């Protein structure tokens, strides 16, 4: 009984950081996890702090290089997120092999000048040599101090 309880708590703790996303490609993304965020509850992004993102996806192409593109739509205005390292090979093994699963652990600092908002949509695209590797949209985010 004790082992089942411990296993259940471990599964719940791992699942608690998984974020609901809308796929904007061909369902290559298996899951997205952000510490402190869960499910469809709004994810609070704090200005001037490190933001961590983990994504698991299947490569839909062979690619020597990979890039990440992050855009935020804040109160209806889309902007490129500044200050990101867009070279995914710094965060995962390259080259990519079609059909293989990859796990990215990506961290960047949210600029202090980011506008506060209760209505933020974040779009993350992973790009390979031949176009989009994977794409996800998180529709429940807020930017606060």
Swiss-Prot record:
Q: What does UniProt give as the signal peptide span? A: 1-16
Keywords assigned: Allergen, Disulfide bond, Secreted, Signal
Instruction: Give the intrachain disulfide bonds.
Output: 24-135, 37-43, 89-94
The answer on whether this UniProt entry bears the keyword Disulfide bond reads: yes
Q: Which SMART domains match?
A: ML
Q: What is its main location?
A: secreted
Q: A cellular component term (GO) from this record?
A: extracellular region
Instruction: List this protein's GO terms for biological process.
Output: sterol transport
Which named protein is this?
A: Mite group 2 allergen Eur m 2
User: What organism is the protein native to?
Assistant: Euroglyphus maynei
């Amino acid at each position: 009984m004790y082992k089942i309880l411990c296993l259940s708590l471990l599964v719940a703790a791992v699942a608690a950081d998984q974020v609901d996303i809308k796929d904007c490609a061909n369902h290559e993304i298996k899951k997205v996890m952000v510490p402190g965020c869960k499910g469809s509850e709004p994810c609070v992004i704090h200005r001037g702090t490190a933001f961590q993102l983990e994504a698991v996806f299947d490569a839909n192409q062979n690619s020597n290089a990979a890039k990440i593109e992050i855009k935020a739509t804040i109160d209806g205005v889309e902007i490129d997120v500044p200050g990101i390292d867009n070279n995914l090979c710094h965060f995962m093994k390259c080259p990519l092999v079609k059909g293989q699963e990859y796990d990215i652990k990506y961290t960047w600092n949210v600029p202090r000048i980011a506008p506060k908002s209760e209505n933020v949509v974040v779009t993350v695209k992973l790009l390979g040599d031949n176009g989009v590797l994977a794409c996800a949209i998180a529709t429940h985010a807020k930017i606060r101090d």
